[in-house]
Amino acid sequence: MGKLTLLLLILLGWLQYSLWLGKNGVHDFVRVKDDVALQEVNNGKLKARNDQLFAEIDDLNGGQEAIEERARNELGMIKPGESFYRLVPDQSRRNASIPSTQNNAQQ
């Protein structure tokens, strides 16, 4: 009876070791679970970006407004007889706010 008990205890110890520390054990399970959660977050961000790009492609294929907007903003083009005004922020206000922000960052 003693040998059977010892054999069962050794078997139990080996199973516990395999469960907690062995290959595909609890440690590996937790690590893979964390990796999957991180990948799902990354996939969500990439899916949102892809959806935005597909919407932009559909807009470019279907409507003239998006093409005109890009031509104005990126190429500086305008329609005949049209006046295009671009408002630029006041440089004196930008320069006045930059040193105060840098002083706050240094303190």
UniProtKB/Swiss-Prot annotation:
Assembly with partners or alone: Part of a complex composed of FtsB, FtsL and FtsQ.
Protein name per its UniProtKB record: Cell division protein FtsB
Sequence ranges on the Cytoplasmic membrane side: 1-3
Against Gene3D superfamilies, the record matches this protein to: 1.20.5.400
Q: Does the keyword Membrane apply?
A: yes
Q: Which residues form a coiled coil?
A: 39-62
Spell out where the chain crosses the membrane.
4-21
Report the family membership: Belongs to the FtsB family.
Taxonomy, superkingdom: Bacteria
Q: Could you tell me where this protein is found in the cell?
A: Cell inner membrane
Periplasmic side, ranges:
22-107
Alphabetical list of InterPro entries matching this protein: Cell_div_FtsB (IPR023081), FtsL/DivIC (IPR007060)
Q: Which UniProt keywords apply?
A: Cell cycle, Cell division, Cell inner membrane, Cell membrane, Coiled coil, Membrane, Transmembrane, Transmembrane helix
Q: Does the keyword Chaperone apply?
A: no
Which HAMAP family is this protein grouped with? FtsB
Q: Which membrane topology term applies here?
A: Single-pass type II membrane protein
Its Gene Ontology cellular component terms are: cell division site; cell septum; plasma membrane
What does the record give as the function of this protein?
Essential cell division protein. May link together the upstream cell division proteins, which are predominantly cytoplasmic, with the downstream cell division proteins, which are predominantly periplasmic.
Pfam families recorded for this chain? DivIC (PF04977)
The biological process GO terms on file are: FtsZ-dependent cytokinesis
User: Which source organism?
Assistant: Yersinia enterocolitica serotype O:8 / biotype 1B (strain NCTC 13174 / 8081)
